[in-house]
Every structure is written in C-alpha cells, then in structure tokens.
C-alpha cells in the first residue's frame, strides 16, 4: 500500500477483513482499531507484522469504562519519535492504571541489559496499546526482550511479565525502513480487577438543591459520595422523555416518547440561569422547598412547576442561547432526532393526545412539512424552539456530569430499554421498523405469575437487518456520548421477544417471536390428539365458585353462556377478549369489581394452545398452562403427552434457532461503541443465551434470590462468573429488608442455609444481618457488585429508612405503578454520615474491591 504522507507525519487507523468475490465473509475484532504513526519521510517503507484479532477474552478492559474512567491514563505520552531505521514494538496491556506504564527490557545496552531499573518506558499515546520505536541501527540481533510493569513516579520496575523471553531474529532492515511488530499481549501477576457501585434512579436523588426530583446536577453530588466510599460505578434507570399526558402515569421510565431526548424534569434549573423577575424567583424558591420536602416525588407538581420555569427562562435567555455557537454545534449534530421530537411534543400538547393517529393534522409523518414548521419564520417555531432549548441544557448538564465522573474514576452506567412506546417519535417517524399490531412483554416469572405486558410494539427485525441495524447503531452511539457502560434491558429480546396479541391484557396468551410453531400433526405425534376445544377457554361449573366465590351467579348471568355440554360455558360474544372485559370494568376500582375482572381474565386465558400469528393451522402451547383448569381436565396420559411437547418446545426446540437470531444482531451492535456491555438475563432463559453472552464477552446479571440453576432456591455467590454484575435486588424487586419480611419460611431457609446461622431467623433484617449479606455479595467472584442505595443504607440502623415499605421502586405485576421513590435523606447528609461511609469503605477494601494497581 502506498500513501502520500504530509511532512509532519500522520496517523492511520486500520483493521483486516476477509473478502470473497467482493463480499465480506469475516471481519476481525476492530472495536479498538490498530493505530500506526507514520513518519513524514517520503522515502519511508514500513513492514508490518500483525496477527488476526479475535474478540479479546478480557474485552471489558478495552471498554471506555476502563480506558476513560477506571484505569484511565489522562496524561498520555507523546507519539514515540521516528528513526531512519526503526523497530516499532507494540503490546496490549489494558490492566495498568495511571501510576504505571509498560516498559521494555532486553539483552543489550539499548534495552537496559536486563536491568529492570534501566528498562525503557513505552508510550501510552494509544492506550491500552503501548508502543516504542527503537533505533534499529543501534541494536544487535537476535534480540531478546521482555515487558515490565514500571512505576512512573518511583521510576522503578514493579514486576516482569508472565512469559518466556521474546525473541526477534535480524530483520535485515535498510535505511528508511521500519519494522512494526504488533498485536502482542503483556500479562502480569496483578489481582483481577473488581469494583463496587451503586444503583439509583436519577429521579430518586435528593440534594438540598433538588426541585422535588433528582436532576443531572445531583449526579455530581452522587459521584462525590461514590468517590468518598471507593465505589466505582453509578447505575441509573432510563432518563428519556416519557411525557404522554403530563399525569403521574408518565413516571414509567421505560415508556419513552423518544430514544434520544432526555426528560425535561432532569434539568437542574439553577444551571439554566437565574430569573431576573425577583418575585417569580422567590415563588420558585418557595415551591422548591415544598416539593423537596415531600417523602416521594410528586410527578405532576414537579413537572408543572419546572415547565413554568422553563417558559420564563426561555423567554428571558432563549434568543441569546439559540444564537450561540455552542448551540449551533449541538443542533447540527442532533437535528435528525431533535426536530421530529420537538414537533411531536408540540403537537402532542396542541392536540391533547400522544396518539398521533388521532391528530387532525400531521398524523402521518412528512419530513418536508416538519421542516417547514421548524423554520424560524414559522408561527409554530417559538413553541418548537423551547424544546431545543431544554434539550440543549440537558445535554450540557449530562456531558458535564460524565466528564466529572471520568475525572474521578467513576463510571456512569446507563440503561437501554428493550421497547419503545407505540405513541412515540420513532413510531411516528419510522413505523416500518416496528410491528404495531402486537405487544411486547415477558412470560410468567418470579416478577409476575401472569407474565408482563409492557404494551410496546415489537421490532421488525427483517427490515432492520436490511440497513445493517442502523436504527440501533445510532442509538448506541448516541448513548456513548454520556455513558461508559450500559445495561441491556431484557437482552433476551435480541434472541426472541414475547409478543402478546392486542386483545390480551395479561402476558399468558403470548408467543415467542420469532419461533417455530407446531402443526396439528406434530402435536399428535407426542400422543395428544388435537381438538378444536383446546383453542377456546375451558369454563366449567366445577371451578367457577373457586374463582368467583359469592359473585358466581352474577358472573354466569352477565358474562357467560351455557354450552351444549352440561356444566360447560362459553364467554358471551361481547366479552370474548380480555380487552373487552377491561373496557367493561374501566373506572370500577372497588375490590369486588377487580375480583370479577381478574377472574374473567383467568377464564379467557385458560386455553391449551395459542394460534400462531402468521402461519395458519400452526400453534404454540400456552405458557404456564399446567397451573390452569384446562390442563387439569386432561387425563394422565394426555397430561404426560402435553408435558413432553411443552418441554421440547420451550426448552430445546429453539436453542440453535434463537442463537442464530441473536448472532445476526448483537455482535455488531455491542461492538458499535466501546461502552462496557451488561445484559439483564433474568426470567425464562434459553440455553443459548449464556453461550452467546460468553462469546461476545457480555456481563451477565446475577441475583441470589433468582438463581440461574433451576434446582437451587438461592444462588451460590462463589459460583458467579467473573464476567458478571452481582446485586442483591433490582428496581423491579423488593429491597433486602423488604424481601426479608415477605415470606418467613423462605427467609428462614436463607438464614440457615446461605448465612449458616442456627435457630430462628429474626422477623426483620437487622443492620448486622444486612451487613453480612452485603459483605457476602462483595466477596463474590463478579467483576462488579452494584447495590441499590437502599441496600447500602440497610447496614446502618441510624441511616436506613425507618419505613421499609417506602423503599420499593416498582412492582412489575402492577401496570400502573407510580415510579416516585426518593432518598429519605439528602446527599449532603449522606456525605456527612461518617460511620456509614467508613463502614462501606472498609467493606469494599476488605473484599478486594478497592484495587491499588
């Protein structure tokens, strides 16, 4: 390859791929590209000896979480000087913190004559790749050398690499030739890196400056606390805008209207400027104290008040800000999503609905029409520009928090929701990417016995594949501007998604998409004669009283019709679906109405098979049917036959098929950025998931009360894989203290078997018990142990919340959960809680999660 190089030299990045007939058949791992520094000498020739790069086993060390924060080298060395006859030696050594560097030592004077204190430091200009250019004219061949871990300040060797001497025969270089030897790896006897962190939603943060909700300014204060306690990661929930109706139901952080825009409530209004109107400023100061004094977030009051402030500060400062060069850069970089989002938000409020299908105008997205609305001379522009202004400030504030975190060696870990709202900017502007006639959810699990119905549309992966998953690539790349690690919510959705028909409320009537449905002949091959009755709800006199109690007669009269078979009933035509039943009971929230409604949902889902959504005369066994009445109506032979096909269908049939589906998407998506990737792999997990995550070096999630081994009631912390995130509880679960009080018998077993205590378990989780559980988790094998703030505070009787019920963030079985949990103390108080902070520091240090190297 011949290149024209400027006199000052240049840098090139490159990687390798294999092509056949101009078609790429294989690419090497290139998330961290090779970098070559070229001399400005026009006569220069380079001989390059590279090795094909597969994905590194220790991929996490190459992530921006490590290279930009945890093991960052902020003061990079200069590009190594060039020689007329050069030998460039490169090596990867990512597990070296800023106090150390890689050095080279060898069998001659130019390399220190094997004296480690005379080793030659290498350049970290392309960290975590180290390199040095030696003057080959001063070298004697054959050359022998080794790499050394070298302390920069003390200027002495710390340890030699774990390898035999490296050997290089005479390359017979001529003047103006340079040999580049790369893709070497240096390994040292350094303990594996482990860290601890905290998980807390941004809305839950509380400082003395908060406005009734946590904001991006509060993130800096949380970073300060993390640093003071030697925690390395702050994990948050999604922060995208979820504004639909401006009601508390918008508090659900996973139902965003944009995958790019941030929720306006996260703006720190103090950073946006001070109102010149002193009476208005005084009013907001008073409101701030009122809202911040509440034990939980008042979503509606917070957002209403902040929006009043946004309008006033925009009127005062907007014109100047929008004319600034910094805003111009932001706008040009984000125009593609910012304009549709701003217009969508404006029209949502103007037409008083987020359902764009109901808008009298612009219900079908037209880019040219939107462009006209966004022109400064448009009558709509002032309303639209307000959203530009808010998003610009949110961007500045989060970028500042990210920079602050990196400077202090802390990783901000974001959250990528698996779904989007069907009433969102993306559904409006790019409907071809989604299946809007279905609902995404999850099959039954420990979180919800009826499964979960998230209401999101599912993805049209066939369309996404055609453009190389551009939609996802842009999403990940945008996220990498703010985060160095992220959690893939429901990573199973990249293998298959649980799709629920629009007429269903619960998740039980769903089916996996994509999947391989069963024909009637295949069902019968298991010994179960197929009958049409298996497709309709089984409703029999014998169990109606069990379901409805004193309401049985009312249910028969109002919702059921007798069938020809004595004792058997069908649903009336107007109540054949769960949505029809839901509509009938809309607004009726008394105990009896909910009892009857939920009982009818149970009847409607009592089918043995669910028809496939695409292939006629193909079926799926209904998930979890063994607990329901239609299964009990089968004889023993039929039950055994059904269980055989059920086991084959759900646990074996799709393993290779789903693996192929995931490997189409996940490799290029997870490698599109250098963020550290963590997968939420809970629930009904196919066997193929762990192997794919292992192949792609994705961190798993490990929770002791949700073990991956179905034969265990609790997970064994010492068996957790190193490449994992360990936690006690997630936002979808009760906290440690809450769980302790939920099921006394289970708690007793945990107390005796996992904690190894004799006798009767305490009825509440004492600070001492909580500290023991926390310590055990910190001692696990996992690279990261990230605990919720509530679980960290549980170890101290003085600082834990007196009311354990206030600590729960979400109840997945409740589709109308109010996401409003806030810290019961301020971040300023937390910083001053010396005994608690000392205890956390000691726990982290004692368990090896405060590495010095």
Each model region followed by its residue ranges:
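Aromatic-rich carbohydrate-binding modules that target alpha-glucans
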Residues: 1-11, 17-40, 93-142, 150-173, ...
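Catalytic cores of glycan-processing enzymes that make or break glycosidic bonds
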Residues: 58-81, 88, 135, 169-853
